[in-house]
């Protein structure tokens, strides 16, 4: 009797497409993390640093605050009272330990009152007039948000693509559905980064499957610089997102990928395993296994 092989379509998250863009091997190691001890290494690594707040952890806390700023823009835009803005900043900083509890615990951090105060002080001292002025001035995105509101971290799933993801903000402006992403890194001189275009294209395809409408544009908020950029969702971005989706599926099914061209190996928790696995793969190839 002939055996019928049922092809199981591997589920993929948009965040895994972004890991692939940084380095394809991150997808490989993160997928295998639970079963093979990689995760316990990463955990021990953060536990060992738990007693002090390192510069890297401080910058992560700052990223959480910036992200919350982006979610609270409607309170800041148009506000001219500096005392009110200081109070809003206080509220945002104080909400961070509750909203990002899982992430902070992952870092081995508990944001005690003293630390929150210190973070708040540093943050307020680090703000500059130009940045605040840009946040307080209405732009195309904040106008859309004022008129239509937005849904925070909307989770979407496409059965056709077997792809899921949650976009930071989803604006439904009458017939148009617009994805919006918050980024805490630097902005490019013009437009949006290639990886951000690919991520927006992936969200666009999820939205199209869920809402049945074509997504033509998306926004990226580079909140650290108060830069709000709109970008068209191009055919080439969609094609690249689909191509990466295919590669991520292969990796999740066991393929060991090459390193990314600009892989950030010096800060990677998997560097120890990465070389071991490379050797093992080469050896396996030589032995024909
Ligand atoms: S060590 Fe380098 S190549 Fe290996 S997973 Fe990390 S970033 Fe990628």
Set out the residue ranges of the language-model regions.
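Short, intrinsically disordered, charge-biased short linear motifs at domain edges
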Residues: 1, 8-11, 247-262
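Metal-dependent nuclease catalytic cores that hydrolyze phosphodiester bonds in DNA/RNA
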Residues: 1-172, 286-289
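Cysteine-cluster motifs in flexible loop/terminal segments that predominantly coordinate metals
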Residues: 15-29, 253-289
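Short helix-capping/linker segments at secondary-structure and domain boundaries
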Residues: 30-39, 208-214, 276-280
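Residue-level signal for alpha-helical context at structural boundaries
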Residues: 35-38, 221, 236, 259, ...
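Noncatalytic linker/hinge segments flanking ATPase motor cores
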Residues: 71-75, 209-211, 219-225, 257-265, ...
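Mg2+/Mn2+-dependent nuclease catalytic core
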Residues: 141-246
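Short, surface-exposed, charge-dense and proline/glycine-enriched linear segments
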Residues: 211-213, 241-254, 284-289
């Amino acid at each position: 009797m002939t055996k019928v092989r049922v092809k199981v379509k591997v589920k993929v998250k948009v965040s895994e497409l972004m890991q692939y863009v940084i380095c394809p091997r991150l997808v490989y190691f993160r997928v295998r993390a639970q079963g093979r001890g990689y995760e316990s290494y990463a955990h021990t690594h953060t536990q060992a640093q738990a007693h002090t707040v390192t510069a890297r952890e401080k910058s992560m806390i700052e990223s959480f605050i910036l992200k919350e700023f982006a979610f609270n823009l409607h309170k800041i835009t148009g506000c001219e009272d500096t005392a009110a803005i200081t109070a809003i900043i206080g509220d945002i900083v104080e909400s961070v330990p509750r909203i990002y509890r899982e992430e902070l615990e992952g870092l081995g951090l508990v944001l005690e009152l003293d630390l929150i105060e210190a973070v708040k002080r540093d943050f307020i001292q680090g703000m500059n007039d130009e940045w605040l002025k840009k946040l307080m001035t209405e732009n195309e995105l904040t106008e859309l948000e004022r008129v239509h509101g937005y849904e925070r971290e909307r989770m979407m799933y496409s059965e056709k693509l077997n792809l899921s993801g949650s976009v930071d903000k989803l604006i439904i402006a009458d017939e148009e559905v617009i994805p919006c992403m918050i980024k805490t890194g630097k902005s490019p001189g013009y437009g949006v980064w290639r990886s951000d275009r690919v991520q927006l294209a992936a969200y666009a395809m999820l939205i199209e499957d869920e809402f049945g409408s074509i997504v033509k544009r998306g926004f990226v908020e580079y909140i650290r610089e108060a830069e709000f950029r709109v970008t068209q969702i191009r055919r080439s971005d969609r094609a690249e997102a689909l191509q990466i989706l295919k590669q991520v599926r292969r990796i999740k099914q066991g393929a060991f990928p090459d390193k990314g061209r600009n892989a950030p190996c010096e800060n990677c928790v998997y560097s120890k395993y990465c070389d071991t696995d490379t050797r093992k793969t080469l050896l396996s190839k030589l032995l024909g296994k």
